[in-house]
């Protein structure tokens, strides 16, 4: 039987990310086109809305990831070096990664799994849901912080720096970045986490190749997406109220818009004023969002084979293995540093 001691949550935040969000919101709303930052959508309540939305029957990315993990987890586990530090960059969906953790345990791989998340309460819930008493070889811990905090922690923590590292990027996370920024982010991961033990360290990520607009739009307008999107405005009000004492946003004034961009090969999610120009509340009261003006908050890029090849190559990485299933547009890729 495993340890009865509860897994530890390490606070690795170099600064409280919440403090930077208001400035990011203001900068995005002053830009052209207007945008909202991703961090605004991942409050504790936002993450809970996201989890409910991503379980909708039409949200194929999650269902396909689980199908593949159930079928291929044993092979994936075999590709992860014994003694690895496994860092899950976004741990909200335990129902996915648990299949890989169980396969690592069955293979008697002595690894330590670190769940990383922005929300302390979500980390606590995730760890409580893991049946740790059923694991002997796999150990559990958690990291409270951002992606960048996690990468810096990996690079600077002497006790684990020289161990093999496996970074998990499930949930099509890399698709949320523009194509150039996705390559930069992967290169950043490699430079922080793979270079100390390049032959044994890797990134395990998912990408989506679906460019069928009807399937994509149906997934990204599934039940639960509207509460998820509007929760960001409530969270923004909470952050700004500390200074202004009034609401910046009225969620009733906005609606959610889902579009497929044929040219860029991506899904685009925006919030749009319902019926009139909107003057925001203090301290953003100098900003007006025009009627029908899109405030984009998220994109999901889809990757065909040539785009994948360019992404990995630009990042200085090579895919050494991949896993998918017939009928699935989602696939898992294991990436390692290109040999010098």
UniProtKB/Swiss-Prot annotation:
Its EC number is 2.1.1.261. It is an enzyme of class 2 (transferase). Keywords: Alkaloid metabolism, Methyltransferase, S-adenosyl-L-methionine, Transferase. One of its GO terms (biological process) is methylation. The keyword Chloroplast does not apply. It catalyses: 4-(3-methylbut-2-enyl)-L-tryptophan + S-adenosyl-L-methionine = 4-(3-methylbut-2-enyl)-L-abrine + S-adenosyl-L-homocysteine + H(+). GO terms for molecular function: methyltransferase activity. Pfam families: Methyltransf_33. Pathway: Alkaloid biosynthesis; ergot alkaloid biosynthesis. 4-dimethylallyltryptophan N-methyltransferase; part of the gene cluster that mediates the biosynthesis of fungal ergot alkaloid. DmaW catalyzes the first step of ergot alkaloid biosynthesis by condensing dimethylallyl diphosphate (DMAP) and tryptophan to form 4-dimethylallyl-L-tryptophan. The second step is catalyzed by the methyltransferase easF that methylates 4-dimethylallyl-L-tryptophan in the presence of S-adenosyl-L-methionine, resulting in the formation of 4-dimethylallyl-L-abrine. Homodimer. Belongs to the methyltransferase superfamily. This is 4-dimethylallyltryptophan N-methyltransferase easF. The lineage of its organism: Eukaryota, Fungi, Dikarya, Ascomycota, Pezizomycotina. The gene is easF.
């Amino acid at each position: 039987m495993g340890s009865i001691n509860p897994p530890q949550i390490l606070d690795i935040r170099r600064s409280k990310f919440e403090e930077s969000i208001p400035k990011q919101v203001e900068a995005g709303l002053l830009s052209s086109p207007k945008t909202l930052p991703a961090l605004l959508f991942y409050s504790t309540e936002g993450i809970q809305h996201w989890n409910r939305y991503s379980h909708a029957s039409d949200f194929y990315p999650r269902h396909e990831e689980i199908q593949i993990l159930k079928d291929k987890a044993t092979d994936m586990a075999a590709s992860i070096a014994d003694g690895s530090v496994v860092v899950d960059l976004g741990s909200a969906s335990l129902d996915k990664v648990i299949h890989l953790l169980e396969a690592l345990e069955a293979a008697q791989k002595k690894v330590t799994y670190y769940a990383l998340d922005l929300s302390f309460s979500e980390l606590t819930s995730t760890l409580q849901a893991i049946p740790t008493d059923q694991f002997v070889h796999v150990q559990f811990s958690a990291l409270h912080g951002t992606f960048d905090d996690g990468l810096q922690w990996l690079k600077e923590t002497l006790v684990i720096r020289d161990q093999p590292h496996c970074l998990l990027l499930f949930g099509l996370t890399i698709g949320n970045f523009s194509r150039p920024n996705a390559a930069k982010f992967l290169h950043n991961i490699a430079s922080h986490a793979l270079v100390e033990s390049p032959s044994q360290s890797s990134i395990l990520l998912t990408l989506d190749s679906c460019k069928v607009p009807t399937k994509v739009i149906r997934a990204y307008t599934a039940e639960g997406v509207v509460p998820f999107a509007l929760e960001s405005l409530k969270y923004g009000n909470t952050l700004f109220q500390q200074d202004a004492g009034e609401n910046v946003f009225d969620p009733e004034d906005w609606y959610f818009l889902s579009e497929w961009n044929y040219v860029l090969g991506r899904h685009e999610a925006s919030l749009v004023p319902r019926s009139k120009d909107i003057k925001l509340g203090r301290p953003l009261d100098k900003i007006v969002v025009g009627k029908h003006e899109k405030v984009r908050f998220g994109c999901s890029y889809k990757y065909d084979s040539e785009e994948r090849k360019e992404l990995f190559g630009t990042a200085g990485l090579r895919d050494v293995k991949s896993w998918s299933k017939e009928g699935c547009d989602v696939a898992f890729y294991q990436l390692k540093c290109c040999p010098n």
